[in-house]
Amino acid sequence: MLNRYPLWKYLMVFFAIITAALYALPNIYGEDPAIQVTGARGASVDMSTLDAVTTALDKEQLSHKSIALENGSILVRFNDTDTQISARDVISEALGKDTIVALNLAPSTPDWLEAIGASPLKLGLDLRGGVHFLMEVDMDAAMEKLVGQQEEAFRSELREAKIRYRAIRPSGKEAVEVLLRNEEQLAEAKAMLEKNHPDMLFVESDSNGRYALTATFTEQRLQEIRNYAVEQNITILRNRVNELGVAEPLVQRQGASRIVVELPGVQDTARAKEILGATATLEFREVDDKADLSAAANGRAPAGSEIKMDRDGRPVVLKKRVILGGQSITDASSSVDEYGRPQVNISLDSEGGNKMSAFSKKNIGKLMATVFAEYKDSGRRTPEGKVILDKHEEVINQATIQSALGRNFRITGIDSAAEAHNLALLLRAGALIAPISIVEERTIGPSMGQQNIDMGIQACIWGMVAVMLFTLLYYRGFGLIANIALMANLVLIIGVMSMIPGATMTLPGIAGIVLTVGMAVDANVLIFERIREELRDGRSPQQAIHQGYANAFSTIADANITTLITAIILFAVGTGAVKGFAVTLSIGILTSMFTAIIGTRCIVNLIYGGKRVDKLSI
């Protein structure tokens, strides 16, 4: 019999729409301003932490809707954002540096919906408000640092092998040149270094009594270095974001050397920019106490040493070899010494502790300097438009090694408590592998985000109203069926997106929904026009319905599959905003095919199937 579906098809459509509606429902309930408290660096929060938070809020008379310990973190809900911001400062002061206190928005989803895993869609930066940074990793500086490390490695290895050399110096941006005394030493050095460094290419040259060995990295190794610089910087930026206390941040790679950082809900954008863009780190160097100070004042330093200035502008001669860098620091905190001066307490990892212990044992009575290094925007750009960074280094502390140092010690010579606090924060989060510059900054206020939501919803509503009026007036009864399918399609899109872990609704995503609303009716228009053609050809209403759906299917499938391929390509090659549009469009294409072909057919079959029909309302 024509136009009859088996029972399972009706049940499939019914349960699909009901399931989507349940998962879309949490988006109606909205969100509460909240604070999330989690442990820092592996620490955990427990009931004692919960009591401390409650006590701190009660002491300052800050009211809250609820407070609970859930999944290893404390969630405090508030009635308004003003109380939320005040409470963040109070809780941070009460708990100290062992916790991360983050502003958040907690969904007001009922427990029965949470029990089935239903949660509202996450809103992107353009809808929620916040700050967007596009950062570029300075690969030239990364290579300069690596070449310097290779110079030191070559010096140590040649000394250990007792091969005498004239000089070791950089050659260009990505190579090291070793000058030897004779041909025999050149051959020995090449054999030894090739064995120790299989990822480098060594080319020897012998002209006019100049014996040189030029070492360059293989192309594969260069690519690994570049990838490592970007990936490590991403990890460190994530640590810094955690220190800032931002919930649900986005830190991801874009292209070969760029990183996107999005911080939803951040109000203090200047502070975020200061911490994320900072390139400060520490180096511990041995002071060359045998150097001629008068020569140093004129800018001359002995071989193996270099001149750095202290904060008073006086020259200090330091050995080029770095005892320890910021990468060995596992923890740092700011405090004051017995004289009330700011200081930073440093803890090293086991390898760094062993290096510091071994060095200090051999150099008791000698001076060790703490060098503060930072890259700053020079205001200049390359012909390609890249920001040129200048490296600023200064000696902030010189101390005599009184005894063997271990994994924990302190540094002084810092100007202010605020500087000590910032330096400790950066050292805790980790030193950047290569300096970064902010090439794009965009701030979206919460009111602008809400305006985007309101305008997006209005566009969706008016788009649906216009389409529904047209189909209702032009196709009458069948137009009403198409309108029911259109509303079901919208529920399916929101429901499916709410089910996808990590899916984010953005303004381009809303544009994708509005576009899908128009596209969803296309399939119904094709079907209804085919039914009209079949009726004009003299077929009965039942045959016209059957042939209309059957003949229109291939056209609908072809059109939607080609659009789906385009959406997949957009997702594969696009950035954040384009990806959001592509995801929504892809889901919309699939759901519109489902509702237009199967959904409307179910309704049509229920109304007309198995009955004698003389006329169709189309």
UniProtKB/Swiss-Prot annotation:
SUPFAM superfamilies: Multidrug efflux transporter AcrB transmembrane domain. GO terms for molecular function: protein-transporting ATPase activity. Its main location: membrane. It comes from the Bacteria. One of its GO terms (biological process) is protein targeting. InterPro entries: Acrflvin-R, SecD, SecD-TM, SecD/SecF_arch_bac, SecD/SecF_CS, SecD_1st, SecD_SecF_C, SecD_SecF_C_bact. Pfam families: Sec_GG (PF07549), SecD-TM1 (PF13721), SecD_1st (PF21760), SecD_SecF_C (PF02355), SecDF_P1_head (PF22599). The chain crosses the membrane at residues 10-30, 455-475, 477-497, 508-528, 563-583, 587-607. Changing R240M: Nearly abolishes protein translocation. It is a multi-pass membrane protein. It is found in: Cell membrane. Keywords: Cell membrane, Membrane, Protein transport, Translocation, Transmembrane, Transmembrane helix, Transport. Forms a complex with SecF. Part of the essential Sec protein translocation apparatus which comprises SecA, SecYEG and auxiliary proteins SecDF-YajC and YidC. Part of the Sec protein translocase complex. Interacts with the SecYEG preprotein conducting channel. SecDF uses the proton motive force (PMF) to complete protein translocation after the ATP-dependent function of SecA. Expression of V.alginolyticus SecDF in an E.coli secDF mutant restores protein export in a Na(+)-dependent manner, strongly suggesting SecDF functions via cation-coupled protein translocation. Belongs to the SecD/SecF family. SecD subfamily. This is Protein translocase subunit SecD. It comes from Vibrio alginolyticus. The gene is secD.
